[in-house]
UniProtKB/Swiss-Prot annotation:
Role of this protein: Activator of cell division through the inhibition of FtsZ GTPase activity, therefore promoting FtsZ assembly into bundles of protofilaments necessary for the formation of the division Z ring. It is recruited early at mid-cell but it is not essential for cell division.
Gene designation per UniProt: zapA
Keywords from the named record: Cell cycle, Cell division, Coiled coil, Cytoplasm, Septation
GO biological process: division septum assembly; FtsZ-dependent cytokinesis; septin ring assembly
Protein name per its UniProtKB record: Cell division protein ZapA
Subunit relationships: Homodimer. Interacts with FtsZ.
HAMAP family attached to this UniProt entry: ZapA_type1
Family per record: Belongs to the ZapA family. Type 1 subfamily.
Subcellular location(s) of the protein: Cytoplasm
Naturally occurring in which organism (per UniProt): Yersinia enterocolitica serotype O:8 / biotype 1B (strain NCTC 13174 / 8081)
UniProt xrefs under Pfam families: ZapA
Gene Ontology terms: cellular component: cell division site; cell septum; cytosol; plasma membrane
InterPro entries attached to this UniProt entry: Cell_div_ZapA-like, Cell_div_ZapA-like_sf, Cell_div_ZapA_eubact, Cell_div_ZapA_N
Highest taxon, organism lineage: Bacteria
Length: 109
């Protein structure tokens, strides 16, 4: 489906952006999140320049994204390591099971 124009409000300004209909709710939630971030920054920093607030918010979001990427990378690496350990454990168990089966077969001959 093609993108449709959607009007959103960010920090008192109207913006019209193109958005696929199935992502419109996510866009509205993102706009609400950005509005809240900007409002919180304005109160916390006492900065009144909207452009400066937007840049600070953008830097904060980029930093959060970088942190989440690192956590995801660390998690994936940890899972890969655990999978390798499980594979080794399973392979070892299968080898031992094979040895036990060979001994049992030899006893019956």
């Amino acid at each position: 489906m093609s993108a449709q124009p959607v009007d959103i409000q960010i920090f008192g300004r109207s913006l019209r952006v193109n958005c696929p209909p199935e992502q419109q709710d996510a866009l509205n939630m993102a706009a609400e999140d950005l509005n809240q971030r900007l409002q919180d920054l304005k109160v916390r920093t006492r900065v009144t320049n909207t452009e400066q607030l937007v840049f600070i918010a953008a830097l904060n979001v980029c930093h959060e994204l970088a942190q989440e990427r690192l956590k995801t990378r660390d998690y994936a690496s940890n899972m890969e390591q655990r999978i390798r350990m499980l594979q080794q454990t399973i392979e070892q168990a299968l080898l031992e099971q094979g040895r036990i089966s060979e001994r049992q077969d030899a006893q019956f001959e």
